[in-house]
């Protein structure tokens, strides 16, 4: 239902979830909810336009990501579902500029502080070489942080204790880690 979709969108969007992941998770049942597939009426209600369809289908990467989503519906139904999911993500990002700005800050700090080691303090957090110092004195650690250029020349970051445990790192993921770690600090104080 719409309430569950909104809840799912807010939870994922806060940490940088993209439309393809959102669309896929809705089809399988986001966070234990029953599967949801958006239809034409819902897409129209969201304000999906013919231009949105043209823009979406005109970008090869969108179509590739859409085709990689496991589905049992038709291609047309999947396209409508993806257009609606993308519209929700776009609306969230437009309306939640402070959140998006924090992802962008954290994304820049992955390179400048966590990788290059330039200390930076943001409110109660200190970003430094491969770690973020929390108000409790504990640290979030990102060992062996490395960056590799993707096909568009953008640096994609990963970290881990060894080659088998490497994980992607990006601004939204850093925000998620910070929120969870600070929440743990608060709970431990209670």
Residue ranges and their predicted role:
Residues 1-190:
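Conserved catalytic core of nucleotide polymerization and phosphodiester-bond processing enzymes
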């Amino acid at each position: 239902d719409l309430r569950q979709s909104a809840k799912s969108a807010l939870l994922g969007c806060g940490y940088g979830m993209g439309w393809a992941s959102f669309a896929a998770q809705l089809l399988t049942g986001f966070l234990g909810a029953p599967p949801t597939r958006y239809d034409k009426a819902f897409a129209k209600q969201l304000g999906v336009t013919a231009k949105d369809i043209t823009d979406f289908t005109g970008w090869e990467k969108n179509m590739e990501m859409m085709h990689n989503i496991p589905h049992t519906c038709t291609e047309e139904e999947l396209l409508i579902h993806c257009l609606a999911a993308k519209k929700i993500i776009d609306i969230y990002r437009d309306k939640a500029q402070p959140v998006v700005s924090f992802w962008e800050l954290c994304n820049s700090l992955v390179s400048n502080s966590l990788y290059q080691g330039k200390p930076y303090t943001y409110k109660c957090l200190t970003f430094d070489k491969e770690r973020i110092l929390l108000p409790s004195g504990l640290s979030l650690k990102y060992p062996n942080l490395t960056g590799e250029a993707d096909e568009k020349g953008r640096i994609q970051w990963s970290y881990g204790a060894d080659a088998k445990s490497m994980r992607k790192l990006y601004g939204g993921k850093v925000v998620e880690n910070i929120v969870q770690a600070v929440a743990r600090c608060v709970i431990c104080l209670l």
